[in-house]
């Protein structure tokens, strides 16, 4: 166990599950987007009038074909029902002139203290600009684990951040998490007494700060995960070595 290895362990715990969920989200986003961004066409582009013969001519419309002004929704989040609403969803936002708004809010329960998710789907201009904002307070972390990297036995987290998607492809996002009162279980290493001593000293951590950035495109994006866990582990290594040195006095 090293300071760098401990930081990598935390990255493994976060990156694997996060990337799996993001890939599912991108797939759903790409399937939905074409239905919410109807291209503007003129009658001349769609039809060629033939003199002396009947023909249907499509004139420019001042209203979209589909418009949902308001809908009440709910989602299942961590076995908890979260209520929300959807406003101004249309197939032709350039004509309607308003972005679609999706908003979910939930108060305290046994999984978290509060949750908020807000999405603005703005395809009213020449470039689509979609924004997702999330805010978690008091998220229960118990049971998060990764094979070989350890398990979080207990703790709470506050998470917030936003993701912007431009032209339905370019990603730019940043999220921050503050983990509090963490109980971390790291697998024992046979025959490595020092590593096991360090792991024991990390079983209770007061606070871990994590920053995650997302850059690139939907098909090719990078996750950059930074945290102060390396500093925490460095302190644990020093304490463990100091304890061993006292044993030789």
Regions found by a protein language model. Name each.
Residues 53-54:
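A short, compositionally biased domain-edge/stem linker segment
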Residues 1-12, 16-28, 40-42, 47, ...:
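Small-residue helix/turn framework positions
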């Amino acid at each position: 166990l090293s300071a760098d290895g401990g930081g990598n362990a935390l990255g493994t715990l976060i990156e694997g599950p996060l990337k799996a969920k993001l890939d599912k989200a991108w797939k759903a986003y790409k399937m939905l987007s074409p239905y919410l961004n109807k291209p503007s066409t003129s009658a001349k582009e769609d039809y060629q009038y033939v003199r002396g013969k009947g023909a249907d001519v499509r004139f420019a419309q001042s209203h979209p074909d589909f418009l949902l002004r308001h809908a009440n929704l709910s989602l299942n989040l961590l076995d908890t029902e979260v209520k929300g609403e959807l406003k101004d969803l249309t197939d032709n936002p350039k004509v309607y002139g308003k972005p679609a708004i999706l908003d979910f809010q939930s108060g305290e329960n046994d999984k978290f203290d509060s949750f908020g998710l807000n999405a603005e789907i703005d395809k009213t201009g020449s470039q689509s600009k979609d924004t997702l904002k999330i805010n978690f307070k008091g998220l229960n972390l118990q049971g998060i684990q990764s094979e070989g990297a350890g398990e979080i036995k207990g703790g709470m987290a506050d998470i917030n951040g936003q993701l912007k998607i431009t032209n339905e492809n370019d990603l730019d996002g940043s999220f921050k998490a503050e983990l509090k009162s963490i109980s971390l279980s790291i697998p024992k290493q046979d025959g490595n007494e020092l590593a096991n001593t360090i792991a024991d000293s990390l079983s209770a951590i007061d606070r871990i700060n994590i920053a995650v950035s997302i850059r690139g495109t939907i098909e090719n994006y990078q996750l950059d995960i930074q945290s102060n866990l390396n500093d925490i582990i460095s302190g644990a290594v020093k304490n463990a070595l100091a304890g061993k040195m006292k044993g030789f006095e």
